């Protein structure tokens, strides 16, 4: 099976800071792949590069066999990559239903009664049926998270990038949203990339993990392998007591 998305040697500098360094990976259709790393590891910057929000300095991103270099975000979305954001970004001044409609305008075959029906179906799927005409500002934070997913799905993507969807949610809301992500993945045959710091739920959701630190891939493998990987442990909690003691005694 050929990769849905293939990233090769992707790099990005911001002045003297290298935010993403020579990142390469491939994702097969139907996978749920987690992007793991401490704050500042380059995870969201990677999403921004994949979706055209910022240009990369070198490397390539090939999606469905097409090189994405230089394409605007709306063009990339039209090809089948949708995303959510760390902080909810609803279109204020619009209703819940209108937010989903806007998300679907660039989809192939979007527009008209078909888009309306698709939007209603998505709102039902994410648990927002009956709230279509509410102003988005009145939604709870948990419902705004659900709306973000519905709006991303309105574009009928093949690849969905979720950026910390559990941030700011309670344990019950996290469990419900996790179940929703599983249903969406199964029902629509989506490929999913997931950034998340709620590691317990993260590790239960994903089938494979790519771990970043300082913009570089430091490990890749199953969730079980990643949580035991020395480079990942060091990136999150630093050197172990034994190593620290050994260096202190040697000083």
Predicted feature descriptions by range:
Residues 2-251:
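Glycine-rich phosphate-binding loops of nucleotide-dependent enzymes
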